[in-house]
Design a protein with these regions (language model features):
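ABC ATPase NBD coupling module
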Residues: 104-119, 265-266
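Conserved ABC transporter NBD signature motif
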Residues: 92-104
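Conserved ABC ATPase "signature" region
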Residues: 150-168
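ABC ATPase C-loop
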Residues: 189-190
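H-loop/switch region of ABC-family ATPase nucleotide-binding domains
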Residues: 233-234
Length: 375
């Protein structure tokens, strides 16, 4: 999912139609803590025969930070569009089952009504940013709810402060980094006062610093305990420490797992891997190392856990012997080969900016060289 349709890009901020209330009242009592309920939800896009997802049922309450996983094509992004009414109201698709947002049936309430209860942040923040300053951008939604000016400004300030952008409120969004623009999109959702936040791959187009910026903002929201968050994400290295629950869809878009992070990502990692579901890098590495004879109980999720587990055990004998043989063969091959590329003391400037400084490297036959660095 890269972006919503143009007509729906800002539909969460559309003013209510005549006869609608700007702030519908959610169900109270026991239902109050439940922000979202999906009951056997299936979605069939226009022109398609099969529903994807086919049957999804789960709930989200305040304090839940839910990671929604599934193989490519299982309908995760499609499902996110049903959580705030874009399906069926703006995106042509048939919906079966029931989506309830704060007790309201999403099929019979408009996107404008639902926007006060659920905000959505897409993969590409530029699809949602339309004004000339950060403050104007965050005020756009509350203004379209016809709130008093003082309330609009109060909401905008609170939202910008929560994502660390208040001091830059007069700047053009174009001056922000990718991570900054995504934080701005999150602030726009927060300013609507929505207790539920849905994020569809919010870090897909970001560098490591941008990813850190987004999750720093989300960590603060999750710590408050007053929001519910649904996260669709492929970068599980960043997401795993942040979430407290995992829901998994199979290839047909049917829920096959719903539980705590350890129960799902550790306890069912091999099953998820066979299904084509993304896993944390350290968990994938541990699965491969386990095939080579290493023992992991439990499976690691983070690099620190993987490192600690490896430090506690010697390498299996077969691995040590294979490594020694490979090392000897590599040394023989490289020593007999020639240099293909040699760089010495390279400095490069673009206009007044020095982008490379005194770089030296050598590439020989048999080398597999990776060059990494900050953007």
């Amino acid at each position: 999912m890269t972006a919503p349709p143009d007509s729906a890009a800002r539909s969460a901020s559309v003013a209510p139609a005549p006869g609608e209330t700007a702030t519908p009242k959610p169900t109270h009592g026991r239902e109050h803590a439940r922000l979202l309920q999906l009951r056997e939800v299936g979605i069939t896009h226009e022109g398609e025969d099969a529903a994807t997802p086919a049957s999804v049922s789960f709930e989200v309450s305040r304090g839940d930070v839910v990671l929604l996983l599934g193989p490519s094509g299982s309908g995760k992004s499609t499902l996110s569009l049903a959580m705030n009414g874009l399906i069926p109201h703006a995106v042509p698709a048939a919906l079966t089952g029931r989506v309830e947002v704060a007790g309201m049936d999403a099929a019979t309430h408009s996107v404008a009504q639902l926007s006060t209860q659920v905000g959505i942040v897409f993969q590409d923040p530029d699809a949602q940013l339309v004004t000339g300053t950060l403050l104007d951008e965050v005020a756009f939604g509350p203004e379209n709810l016809r709130l008093p000016a003082a309330d609009v400004l109060a909401r905008a300030e609170s939202a910008l402060r929560r994502v660390g952008l208040w001091e830059r409120r007069s700047e053009n969004p174009d001056r922000l980094s990718g991570g900054g623009r995504q934080r701005l999109a999150i602030a726009c959702a927060l300013a609507m006062g929505s207790p539920l936040l849905v994020l569809d791959e919010p870090t897909a187009n970001l560098d490591p610093r941008g990813i850190d910026d987004v999750y720093a903002a989300l960590d603060e929201l999750a710590a408050s305990g007053d929001k519910g968050i649904v996260l669709i994400e492929h970068n599980l290295d960043a997401a795993a420490p942040f979430v407290n629950r995992v829901v998994v869809l199979d290839a047909a878009g049917v829920v096959i797992a719903d539980g705590a992070v350890d129960e799902i990502l550790r306890g069912r990692a091999a099953e998820l891997h066979d299904l084509g579901v993304w896993l944390p890098t350290s968990t994938l590495a541990a699965l491969r190392l386990r095939e080579a004879g290493y023992r992991f109980d439990p499976l690691p999720i983070s690099p620190d856990e993987l490192r600690a587990a490896l430090d506690r055990q010697p390498a299996p004998a077969a691995t040590r012997e294979a490594g020694a043989d490979a090392g000897a063969a590599t040394e023989t091959r490289v020593s007999a080969s020639g240099t293909r590329i040699e760089v010495r003391g390279l400095t490069l400037r673009r206009k007044k900016t020095e982008v490379l400084t005194d770089v030296s490297l050598e590439v020989r036959d048999g080398d597999f060289l990776a060059i990494v660095g900050a953007n």
